[in-house]
């Protein structure tokens, strides 16, 4: 134990500033922050669902995602120095920096100058529900808002098509898949 000038007694091995953390510790912190964000999102949703029902919860969730996905895309673009209109390369880069990317397993394939397919191979929310014996969460209507507005924020020319997303039947190794196409 030591006494700091402010009179705070600390155990030196537990006091640390973010700026002093190693790369591995910072990546762990980012993963924890992503998990915390998702836990809050889930708890908020369940609270609304319990009080007002699933339809109201889904409606409010869509409304929140309409705003959040744009904020997230803009912040990622600013952090990476990406200007709007960057097409497929900008979208692929930004998808890697979403909060989901730190806690889910995802991939981008079928990449061309005008099209790509994004797949969520492991989804923390859906896999938790599966472990609890619950049915797939029907997130398609929210996902359509989330992914289409995320892509349009990066490049307004994007058209987004849902290839599969619960409640749709899906393969065991893909929870959802989205096709992004640049229109002329």
Positions of the model-derived regions?
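Long, well-ordered alpha-helical scaffolding segments within enzyme catalytic domains
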Residues: 143-147
């Amino acid at each position: 134990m030591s006494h700091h000038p402010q009179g705070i007694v600390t155990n030196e091995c537990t006091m640390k500033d973010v700026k002093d953390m190693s790369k591995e510790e910072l990546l762990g912190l980012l993963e924890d922050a992503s998990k915390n964000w998702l836990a809050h999102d889930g708890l908020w949703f369940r609270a609304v669902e319990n009080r007002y029902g699933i339809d109201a919860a889904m409606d409010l969730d869509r409304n929140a995602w309409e705003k959040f996905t744009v904020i997230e895309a803009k912040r990622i673009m600013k952090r990476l120095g990406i200007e709007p209109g960057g097409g497929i390369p900008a979208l692929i880069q930004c998808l890697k920096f979403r909060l989901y990317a730190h806690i889910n397993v995802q991939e981008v394939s079928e990449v061309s100058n005008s099209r790509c397919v994004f797949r969520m191979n492991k989804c923390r929310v859906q896999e938790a529900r599966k472990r609890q014996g619950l049915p797939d969460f029907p997130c398609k209507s929210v996902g359509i808002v989330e992914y289409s507005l995320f892509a349009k924020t990066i490049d307004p020319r994007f058209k987004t098509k849902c290839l599969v997303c619960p409640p749709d039947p899906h393969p065991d190794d893909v929870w959802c898949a989205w096709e992004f196409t640049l229109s002329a």
